[in-house]
Amino acid sequence: MTATWEKKEGNEGVLSVTVPAEKVDKAIDQAFKKVVKQINVPGFRKGKVPRPIFEQRFGVEALYQDAVDILLPEAYGEAIDETGIKPVDQPEINVTSIEKGKEMTFEANVVVEPEVQLGDYKGLEVEKQDVELTDEELQESIDHQLGHLAEMVVKEDGAIENGDTVNIDFDGYVDGEQFEGGQAEGYDLEIGSGSFIPGFEEQLVGVKTGEEKDVNVTFPEEYHAEELAGKEATFKTKVNEIKYKDVPELTDEIANELDSEANTVDEYKENLRKRLTEQKETDAENNQKEEAINKAANNASIDVPDAMINTELDRMVQEFGQRMQQQGLNLETYFQISGQDESQLREQMKDDAEERVKTNLTLTAIADAEDIEVSDDDIDKELEKMSEQFNISVEDIKQTLGNTDIVKNDVRIQKVIDLLVDEAKLVEPSKDDSEA
């Protein structure tokens, strides 16, 4: 078999392939054995028609399409290996000739992985990260944890404050008319949560139980219900009940409830400070990696094919659907609630998908440029790490994966990321960032 690759514009080209006559004849023989089982010819049992009779009655050409179906997968795969191209999408194949006793030729229009023109990826400026835990950050975490132990208590007197949870009835109007979905009774709303239309929650602050208030808002221009987007609305609202959070005082007993390894408030604070500091160090390391990766990718020049973006979008939509399932929703329900459809979701994700593809291509190109290799020992260490992380045996991981190619690639990319960070130049955060 012979194959030649002719590059065209962009990331497209034509793969021209010639399959030897002996392989063609063998495929035609296989096609006959398959087709003859389905043929009825008077005077012969089904599946027992002699080859000469079949060809006389139907012509050998009747076998060509099945022969092509047999030949193409193997021939196309061998042609890819021979030319070294990296297709990123299904090809458009045109069989130019097939005949018994002769070579078969076909052409495949193929979109291939783009060439990556690497820019600077060593000596990148990466901002230093502040890993010192402040007393304010520690107290904020303590308050957050105590908040989980808070009890909701009915506020007998007094008005709504930020952080209260209120039970309300509301009836929404646009242009003096009620609109679908704008009414509810006995609805619980946490003031300050930002879960309602901007401006709604703030206007309830100061209202008391039993009081009514007209809340005037404007729907955002990007609101999912197009018929309401950008329109002014009035919600006639009644406050049925106000509850506030009764947050417990931090005592030794509460400290032990929050952290079973702490017997006193001081021990709890010490343990929490240690955990938060470790998390801050991890976050700082991840932020530096992300900044180095983004800069290396931005410095590279790549013409990303639409096919690769669409493949990445498929993966991202699937991941999004899995996250929705974890929250008890499927994609169909999400689309109904959000007023979106899949095409709109994909459009929102498109830029991120392109960035993902560009980043992966850049990291792979750096690995190639630096001749980064992965040893069997590297793979074994990664498998052991995965085994500890997921509490699954190494053998079970191997069986699930089928092979270690994915692990090998992950380790190779991680080595590239380590290289980027090791070669990076740490700089002080800009003034604007440090004041943020």
Curated annotation (Swiss-Prot):
Gene3D superfamilies to which the protein is assigned, alphabetical: 3.10.50.40, Trigger factor ribosome-binding domain, Trigger factor, C-terminal domain
Cellular component annotations (GO), alphabetically ordered: cytoplasm
InterPro entries listed in its UniProt record: PPIase_dom_sf (IPR046357), PPIase_FKBP_dom (IPR001179), Trig_fac (IPR005215), Trigger_fac_C (IPR008880), Trigger_fac_C_sf (IPR037041), Trigger_fac_ribosome-bd_bac (IPR008881), Trigger_fac_ribosome-bd_sf (IPR036611), Trigger_fact/SurA_dom_sf (IPR027304)
Coiled-coil regions listed: none
Location within or outside the cell: Cytoplasm
Catalytic activity: [protein]-peptidylproline (omega=180) = [protein]-peptidylproline (omega=0)
GO molecular function: peptidyl-prolyl cis-trans isomerase activity; protein folding chaperone; ribosome binding
All copies of domain PPIase FKBP-type, residue ranges: 163-248
Any one of the GO BP annotations: cell division
Record-listed E.C. numbers: 5.2.1.8
Swiss-Prot/TrEMBL keywords: Cell cycle, Cell division, Chaperone, Cytoplasm, Isomerase, Rotamase
Superkingdom per UniProt: Bacteria
A Pfam family that the UniProt record links to this protein: Trigger_N
Main localization of the protein described in the UniProt heading: cytoplasm
Family as reported in the entry's similarity comment: Belongs to the FKBP-type PPIase family. Tig subfamily.
UniProt note: domains: Consists of 3 domains; the N-terminus binds the ribosome, the middle domain has PPIase activity, while the C-terminus has intrinsic chaperone activity on its own.
Known function: Involved in protein export. Acts as a chaperone by maintaining the newly synthesized protein in an open conformation. Functions as a peptidyl-prolyl cis-trans isomerase.
Listed NCBIfam families: tig
Stated name of the protein: Trigger factor
Annotated organism of origin: Staphylococcus saprophyticus subsp. saprophyticus (strain ATCC 15305 / DSM 20229 / NCIMB 8711 / NCTC 7292 / S-41)
